[in-house]
């Protein structure tokens, strides 16, 4: 198992944003590992941007009429398993992955930050297949 395996939930403390925003602790969901150390991933957020007209249930929320999609993780619902620590993982708050916030990241940048102790990377678990 590698940290950047598809479906892995990681935690950076802190995460350094490409746009220069203040670094802060952040979860990181690996969606796909591509060639040349590129990772397709999302930075889940606790900010709820689901329109009030859409029912909020754990799972994929998609409304093509208004071009809205996200995955909603209900707080404290076990969503992943950490094989190393033999424990389940759940987000402590309602958490959202929005389609428009999926990005490409260069894994080599993370490797350098970890090697120089600029950040601590913690493996939280691998998503359950649902």
Task: State where each predicted segment sits.
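Compact nucleic-acid interaction/catalytic patches
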Residues: 21-24, 30-77
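C-terminal terminal-subdomain/extension
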Residues: 63-130
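Loop/turn positions that initiate beta-strands
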Residues: 6-7
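Short, charged beta-turn/beta-strand-edge "cap" motif at the junction between a beta-strand
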Residues: 15-19
């Amino acid at each position: 198992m590698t940290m950047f395996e598809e479906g892995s939930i990681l935690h950076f403390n802190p995460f350094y944003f490409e746009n220069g925003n203040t670094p802060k602790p952040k979860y990181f969901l690996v969606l796909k590992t591509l060639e040349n150390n590129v990772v397709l991933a999302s930075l889940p957020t606790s900010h709820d941007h689901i329109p009030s007209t859409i029912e909020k249930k754990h799972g994929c929320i998609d409304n093509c009429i208004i071009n809205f999609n996200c995955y909603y993780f209900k707080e404290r619902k076990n969503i992943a398993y950490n094989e190393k620590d033999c424990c389940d993982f759940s987000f402590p708050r309602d958490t959202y992955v929005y389609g428009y916030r999926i990005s490409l990241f260069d894994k080599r940048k993370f490797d350098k930050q970890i090697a120089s102790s600029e950040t601590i990377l913690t493996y939280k678990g691998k998503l359950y297949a649902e």
